[in-house]
Regions:
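C-terminal transmembrane helical hairpin of 12-TM major facilitator-type secondary transporters
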Residues: 344, 351-412
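Conserved MFS/SLC helix-loop-helix module at the cytosolic interface between two early adjacent transmembrane helices
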Residues: 8, 85-126
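Hydrophobic core of transmembrane alpha-helices in multi-pass small-molecule transporters
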Residues: 113, 124-142, 291, 383, ...
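Extracytoplasmic gate region of multi-pass secondary transporters
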Residues: 28-39, 268, 274-338, 409, ...
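Glycine-rich segments within core transmembrane alpha-helices of 12-TM secondary carriers
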Residues: 135, 142-144, 151-206, 326-338, ...
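Cytosolic juxtamembrane N-terminal segment immediately preceding the first transmembrane helix
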Residues: 1-41, 45-69, 257-284
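Intracellular juxtamembrane helix-capping segments at the cytosolic ends
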Residues: 35, 39, 138-165, 304, ...
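Long, low-complexity inter-transmembrane loops of multi-pass membrane transporters
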Residues: 210-284, 288, 299, 303, ...
Length: 419
């Protein structure tokens, strides 16, 4: 860990506050099943329910709410789609304009989303569509800006990246808290107004505990970040201004010494462009792999409430119990994700120092193979359990789902950082 301007206390403050931010705000849309329970109780989309006659002797009329379930699933589907579709333009904004601009956009989207939910009613249930999309995009952008915090901790970088992704998974339990508080008499509007007010905390963290541009890797000497009252921000830009002319900065230093002009061999690759990275087979296969895995998880989360309702034969108490159990398991995401980080960083903890340059990068890639295999195995086991139409088996499904998701997102972020 490089010594310098930002002390251990400040780095730990950034790490822990980022962990809280990811764990309480970034991925709350994935706790959708708990919020749906509340929204159904409030009567959102209830006009889509149609009365049907049961085969009982007295021809009791029970509502058929399949259209209501489809509408709730559509809200989640659009929100989760935006979570992935907007990642690319948001990543461009983050790279082009830096951390502060990206986080201000994220905070604006997040605040707008919470306010839309707060002021929605059963008559204005359509507001859920833009609200969930804004919460989803704002949350993923906050997560993207927090990934770079791993650069502050050197050899623990992959562990911290996976830890943040685990906290992102665990944030889905926030909707469980909302569900429990709602059952104890707190209104949905009051809770979402409180979440909107928390944007002030995000703003303070943006100003004082995050860089204006990016956290470089490896860290330059005396690196500092954030505003310093009443002085000037000692960010990477300040370091760049102080650097003697002609000296290479940390992001400009090549991994290996450059060959003299004309000495490059025929087989030596030139500098890799962004287009070459996007068109590479490794990236294409990784995107395809991630898309299939994510689709499985999104399908499960988006259809969980009607699935539990079907398996419980309409028993709302059972549905509530299993919904709570699912949300509680999501809290464990932050505990499961570092296991994947340990797998990814296992070759860095030996007595032999990690090789530098391209050889070290290749060692990192090889270490990620086991992580990818374990992730796929967990997803297969989760899918098998989810296919069993028995309620008690769903407890095992919930556990395997949170393990699989934690390994998927944490391993994906770390793999992209390595590759």
């Amino acid at each position: 860990m490089a010594g310098g301007g930002a002390g251990v206390a400040k780095r730990l403050g950034t790490l822990l506050s980022g962990l809280l931010e990811c764990g309480a705000f970034c991925g709350i849309i994935f706790g959708w099943a708990s919020l749906v329970f509340v929204l159904k109780d409030l009567g959102y989309f209830k006009d889509l329910c149609q009365p049907t006659a049961t085969p009982s002797p007295n021809r009791t009329l029970l509502p058929d709410c399949s259209w209501q379930d489809e509408q709730f699933s559509l809200v989640f589907t659009i929100g989760s789609f935006m979570n992935n579709f907007v990642t690319f333009p948001m990543g461009f904004i983050f790279d082009r304009f830096g951390t502060t601009v990206a986080r201000l956009i994220a905070i604006s989207l997040y605040t707008g989303g919470t306010l839309l939910v707060a002021f929605s009613t059963p008559e204005l249930a359509v507001l859920l569509f833009p609200a969930m999309s804004m919460l989803s995009v704002g949350g993923i952008l906050l997560l993207l800006t927090n990934m770079q915090v791993g650069n502050l901790f050197g050899k623990y970088r992959s562990i911290i990246i996976t830890l943040y992704n685990g906290a992102f998974d665990s944030s889905s339990a926030i909707f469980l808290i909302i569900k429990v508080l709602y059952e104890h008499g707190l209104s949905l509007r009051a809770m979402f107004l409180f979440m909107a007010a928390c944007s002030a905390w995000h703003l303070l963290r943006t100003l004082f505990l995050m860089p204006r541009t990016h956290i470089p890797y490896p860290l330059p000497p005396a690196y500092d970040y954030g505003l310093r009252c009443p002085g000037r921000s000692q960010s990477y830009r300040t370091y760049e201004e102080k650097r003697p002319p002609g000296e290479a900065g940390p992001e400009e230093t090549p991994l290996e010494p450059s060959a003299p002009r004309g000495a490059r061999g025929d087989g030596d690759p030139p500098g890799v462009s962004f287009r070459a990275c996007v068109c590479s087979r490794v990236f294409a296969w990784h995107v395809a792999w991630l898309s299939v895995m994510q689709l499985r998880h999104y399908l499960f989360i988006g259809t969980l409430n009607p699935l539990l309702d079907h398996l419980a034969r309409g028993d709302s108490h059972l549905v509530s119990t299993y919904t709570n159990a699912f949300a509680f398991t999501q809290l464990c995401g932050v505990l499961c994700a570092p296991w994947n980080g340990l797998i990814l960083d296992r070759h860095k903890r030996g007595k032999t120092p990690r090789p530098e340059g391209a050889v070290g990068a290749l060692a990192d890639l090889r270490a990620s193979v086991l992580s990818l295999v374990v992730t796929v195995t967990l997803c297969v086991l989760f899918s098998v359990c989810a296919a069993v139409p028995m309620l008690p088996v769903q407890f095992a499904t919930f556990v395997l789902q949170v393990l699989s998701r934690s390994f998927l997102y944490g391993g994906n972020a770390a793999f992209l950082a390595i590759a």
